[in-house]
Amino acid sequence: MRDALNTGLIEFLKASPTPFHATASLVQRLEAAGYKRLDERDSWDTETGGRYYVTRNDSSIIAIKLGKQSPLLNGIRMVGAHTDSPCLRVKPQPELQRQGFLQLGVEVYGGALLAPWFDRDLSLAGRVTYRRDGKVESQLIDFKLPVAIIPNLAIHLNRTANEGWAINPQNELPPILAQVAGDERIDFRALLTEQLAREHELIADVVLDYELSFYDTQDAALIGLNGDFIAGARLDNLLSCYAGLQALLAADSDETCVLVCNDHEEVGSCSACGADGPMLEQTLQRLLPDGDTYVRTVQRSLMVSADNAHGVHPNYADKHDGNHGPKLNAGPVIKVNNNQRYATNSETAGFFRHLCMAEEVPVQSFVVRSDMGCGSTIGPITASHLGVRTVDIGLPTFAMHSIRELCGSHDLAHLVKVLTAFYRSRELP
C-alpha cells in the first residue's frame, strides 16, 4: 500500500504543475471512480448514494459522496486542503528584452522561498483564454520542457552572497527564455498561440489573457539511502489533496463524505473559489436546502483541515518548541494555536487522536514557539464560515514553500489510513 501510494503521489505531482492542472487531475481520478460533474449553473438532481463533484474557476473542487445514512442524523465528514502553492506568476505584459535575452516579468505568488528558484530548469503552465471563431474559450497548457532559467550571479561578482542576500523580485527574478537578435521583438502571446496549436491542435484567433506559472521540471522522487523521503515541488499542499482523495475513494461507508480542495490559500483564501469565499457553504446549502436542516446537519458534522506541518529540522531544531518537534515518518501532526490560527480544540483533537490510536497510526502535536508568529490554514476560515467543528492536522515537511520540499515516505500511508477511518466513522463526537 505504501509504495503504491507514494508512486501515485509522484505521478499526481507531475501532472499538477498549477492549481488548474491539480483540479483537472482530481477530476480525472474522480470520474474514473464513477463521480459525476454537477454544474453550478444548473439545477441539481442528486440521489442517495450518488457520487458527485463541483469545480469553480477550474482551480477548486468539492467531491461529495452522498451516504445512505441521513446527514441530518449522522453529520457530514469533511476533509479540506488547498490546490495552490507559492510560485512565480507571469505578468500581463511580461516581455523584457535586455542584453540580447528574452525574459519574462514575474510576480511572486504567496510566501515563496525565492533563493531555490535560481539555477533550476523551469517550465511554464496554466490557463489561457483566447478567441476562436468569434467565441471566447479557455484551455490549460503545459510546455513541459525546460524553457527558462534564472541564473545566479557568480560569486566573483557578489562576494557577500553567502553572508545573506536580499533578493529583489522585480530585478532579479525574471527568467531567461532565449537569446534574440538586436532588433528582433518577441510577442509572448504569439508563443502561447503556437503552444495551443502544438498541445491541443487548435488555432486561436488571438490570445486574450492567461494565468501562467513557472515550475521546476525536476520530477518528485523517493530519496535517501533507505528511501525514507519524498522530495518534490508543491507537496504543500498537493500531498494533502492526494491523501484526501485516496481516503475518499477508499471509504466504502454509508456516511456522507466531502473533500474540498480550495485555491488561493497561500494568498489569504479571499476569492470566489477560496476558503474565505462561499463555495463550500453554497454547495452544502444546495444539498440541504432547508435552513433548519442545514444548520442542524453542520452542527453534527466535523472538518479535518489537512495542510502540511513544520517538521523539526536537525540543523535548526531551536526553531521549534522543545516539547513539540514533529518528526518525519512519525505520523500526522495535530496543530494547535490558542490564538485561533488553527481551528483545533480539545474535542476535535481528541477525536482525531482517538482515530489514530484505533488505526495504530502514530500521531504528533505541534505548537509554535511562544516567541514566534504562527501561520494559518483554511481550517479557521472554514470553521468561521460554516460554524463546523474543525481539527487542523498535517504531515511533517522540510523546506515548506521552497521550489522543492521534503516529506517522509511513510507518512502518506499514515494519513490516508486515518482519513479513511474518519470517512468511515459511524459516530462523530
Swiss-Prot record:
GO terms for biological process: proteolysis. GO terms for cellular component: cytoplasm. It comes from Pseudomonas putida (strain ATCC 47054 / DSM 6125 / CFBP 8728 / NCIMB 11950 / KT2440). Keywords: Aminopeptidase, Hydrolase, Metal-binding, Metalloprotease, Protease, Zinc. Belongs to the peptidase M18 family. This is Probable M18 family aminopeptidase 2. It is an enzyme of class 3 (hydrolase). It comes from the Bacteria. GO terms for molecular function: aminopeptidase activity; metallopeptidase activity; zinc ion binding. SUPFAM superfamilies: Aminopeptidase/glucanase lid domain, Zn-dependent exopeptidases. Zn(2+) binds at residues 82, 156, 401. Its EC number is 3.4.11.-. It holds the Pfam family Peptidase_M18. Its cofactor is Zn(2+).
